[in-house]
A protein has these predicted regions:
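Soluble acyl-CoA-dependent acyltransferase catalytic core bearing the H(X)4D motif
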Residues: 1-275, 279-310, 314-328
Length: 328
């Protein structure tokens, strides 16, 4: 599930007060169990593959007919859209040579985690006074912290390649009513060095807007279906070519309770998606909780990275940032 769907599913487990909600619907009885053998699984897989093949065939024929009709009635605009989509697919599916960071260069299979929190009003205020969004302030904070971390290591990284989830909720063809994942991942270089806070926020805003407008971003599902044709080493190289994965998810603005106990924090600890580091933020009850997941081979000094990220958020928001070990 994507971040917003995860929050929605989590809300089903919690109450808005210490006492149970008497009006809450009673869960349905579990379905009766059925014995399932190898033959049943094989038939189910075969039926699913046949349905998928039929859907692809129908979509292909429909698309070809629409294109042929458009070529006759609106030749220039039809071919213009086709060319725009093809070039967009090339940009979105391009495989970079490697990460841009000269420090976060290793990749492994073990991870460590860190966390801290920031007053949400401070982040929202920093964005609002510039006419920008909370996500712009979040991205600028990450950039400031990553710049400080690289300078700690005696290097200046002008840009870092970031993975940024682009929400497709509310778009034409929105799948959120049928699927728990309605995002596509944009991957692009983001400036981190030599810019002021205002410039970093403006750059983040423009970059995310630019990639959200890419036609291929909305083709994530069909592109994923044909990804099995791509050699595994190429897919692995593409995944490891990013330095940082970021994610910002709005959570409930009021306190939640579980079995009468108040939830005091909501730290997101998320997979790196091949990058060296994942930095995610979830807002909850007036605070912004930041979780940091790091690849052990890429980052051997997580405590230093967390301190530099805390400094980055403090610089952008002008507010005191919570300690790194508040709930340790």
């Amino acid at each position: 599930a994507d971040g917003q769907a995860t929050v929605a599913m989590g809300l089903a487990l919690f109450e808005f007060g210490p006492e149970p909600d008497p009006g809450e619907a009673t869960p349905p009885d579990p379905p009766d169990a059925e014995d399932v053998g190898r033959r049943d699984v094989t038939y189910a897989n075969l039926a699913d593959s046949l349905r998928f093949g039929a859907d692809v065939a129908v979509s292909t024929v429909r698309g070809a007919l629409d294109f042929a009709r458009g070529t006759i009635t609106e030749t220039r605009s039809t071919w213009g859209r086709a060319l725009s989509t093809l070039t967009s697919i090339g940009r979105v599916a391009a495989v970079p040579e490697g990460p841009l960071s000269p420090v976060l260069i290793g990749r492994g299979t073990t991870y460590r985690f860190g966390a801290f929190d920031v007053p949400f009003e401070a982040i929202r205020g920093a964005a609002k006074e510039r006419g920008l969004s909370v996500n712009d302030a979040f991205m600028a904070s990450v950039a400031t912290g990553m710049d400080a971390y690289h300078r700690r290591h005696g290097v200046v990284a002008e840009e870092l390649r970031v993975n940024v989830p682009i929400s497709l909720r509310g778009d034409a063809g929105d799948r959120s009513g049928r699927a728990s994942n309605s995002v596509s991942i944009a991957r692009f270089p983001m400036p981190v060095a030599g810019l002021s806070t205002d410039e970093l926020m403006a750059q983040a805003h423009d970059l995310v807007a630019k990639w959200k407008a890419e036609p291929a971003i909305r083709l994530a599902d069909p592109l994923a279906e044909v990804s099995w044709l791509v050699p595994v080493p190429m897919l692995a190289q593409a995944a490891r070519a990013s330095d940082v994965t970021t994610s910002n998810v709005p959570g409930p603005p009021v306190p939640l309770y579980l079995a009468g106990a108040r939830m005091v924090a909501a730290y997101p600890l998320v997979a790196t998606i091949g990058a060296a580091v994942n930095i995610s933020m979830v807002t909850y009850d007036g605070s912004a909780f930041v979780g940091v997941s790091s690849d052990d081979r890429a980052c051997t000094d997580l405590d230093d990275l967390v301190e530099d990220l805390r400094s980055g958020f403090a610089t952008v928001t002008g507010a005191a940032v919570g300690p790194a070990d508040r709930f340790a």
